[in-house]
Design a protein with these regions (language model features):
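Short, structured "edge-of-domain" segments at secondary-structure transitions
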Residues: 1-157
Length: 157
């Protein structure tokens, strides 16, 4: 899918791939040239892209519900868009079939919506996911989405 996002100066852009790579780019250093691109293997693709700030956390979810949590300040900024990025899924786990199905940058109060293979949606507090280490689902996890805390406040008013 093609996503368009607006961002502010000094934010970081993160790309997360199916095979567990995390590529961080500094917004201020991005080129407008059309030849710049991310290099992936033939079997890999981007499952999530988002902007992140220093006060946010990064959540990554595998198809089996394992949650990987990182502070956004641990995001290494790549020197170029053609860099491979950080490896979050070790090669031994890749051989076992572990893959990322979704990722997001979250703040306190945000909610995470999880879609599983049975078609059910589950809404969880982002903070509870970081401590739990996994999500209980009725089937394999297909995707996740974020409901920002500030949008919940607007709806309530």
């Amino acid at each position: 899918p093609f996503d368009l996002m607006l961002c502010k100066k000094q934010e970081r852009l993160a790309f997360v791939t199916y095979e567990g790579h995390l590529l961080g780019l500094d917004i201020d250093d991005l080129s407008y040239a059309s030849e710049e691109r991310i290099r992936l293997t033939a079997t890999d693709y981007v499952v999530a892209s988002f902007t992140t700030r220093a006060d946010e956390s990064l959540l990554f979810v595998t198809q089996t519900g394992k949650v990987v949590h990182r502070e956004s300040k641990s995001l290494d900024v790549a020197k170029s868009a053609t860099a491979k990025g950080q490896t979050l899924i070790p090669p031994s786990r890749l051989e076992q079939g572990v893959r990322f199905m979704g990722a997001a940058s979250v703040r306190d109060g945000d909610q995470v919506v999880v879609l599983d293979a049975t078609g059910r949606l589950k809404i969880l507090e982002a903070g509870s996911m970081t401590g739990a280490g996994s999500i209980a689902a009725d089937g394999l996890i297909l995707s996740i989405g974020i409901i920002p805390a500030d949008s919940l406040k607007r709806v309530a008013s």
